Swiss-Prot record:
This is Non-catalytic caspase homolog csp-3. The gene is csp-3. The lineage of its organism: Eukaryota, Metazoa, Ecdysozoa, Nematoda, Chromadorea. GO terms for biological process: negative regulation of apoptotic process; negative regulation of apoptotic process involved in development; positive regulation of apoptotic process involved in development; proteolysis. One of its GO terms (cellular component) is cytoplasm. Non-catalytic caspase homolog which does not contain the region necessary for caspase activity. Acts as an inhibitor of caspase ced-3 zymogen autoactivation and delays ced-4-induced ced-3 processing. Has no effect on active ced-3. Probably by preventing ced-3 activation, protects cells, whose fate is to live, from apoptosis during embryonic and larval development. SMART domains: CASc. Belongs to the peptidase C14A family.
């Protein structure tokens, strides 16, 4: 009856009436050695105190995060591989999306009665793209 139909819904509701303040963007006052932390885009004078925040989880709340017996967790294994393979030219949000895809498609935990999968998640309030740079690019 509902096969092939939309699998989810999004509701946009106002959660509060509180106004977010702002913070100074202090990158211009940071010594040159640490300038590599700046984004590729020019900075603004002020920013929301809630902006430029990223949180990543190995799984959704209430679900198990799996680990190989001899290696690290599935999420950390794939995050490491994705960063090593793609960090030079891919921004962080896309690296995390690729990590999520790999964990969901690649891994299964063999339980006695059923097979378990894992789905990482992250949320981002980035206002800019964040790229990793090699040491050669910094110095």
């Amino acid at each position: 009856m509902f096969f092939g139909k939309l699998g989810g819904f999004a509701f946009f509701l106002q959660r509060a009436v509180r106004c977010d303040g702002f913070i100074d963007n202090f990158f211009d006052r940071i010594p040159k050695f640490f300038q590599f932390m700046k984004s590729k885009f020019p900075s603004h004078q002020t920013s929301s105190s809630q902006a430029d925040l990223l949180v990543s989880f190995s799984t959704s709340p209430g679900f198990l995060s799996f680990k190989d017996e001899t290696k690290d967790t599935w999420y950390i294994q794939e995050l490491y591989r994705v960063i090593i393979e793609n960090a030079k030219d891919t921004h962080l949000a896309d690296l995390l999306t690729e990590t999520n895809r790999r964990v969901v498609e690649k891994y299964e935990a063999d339980k006695v009665v059923f097979v378990c999968k894992q789905a990482p998640e992250f949320w981002s309030r980035f206002t800019k793209q964040l790229f990793f740079m090699s040491r050669n690019d910094v110095f």
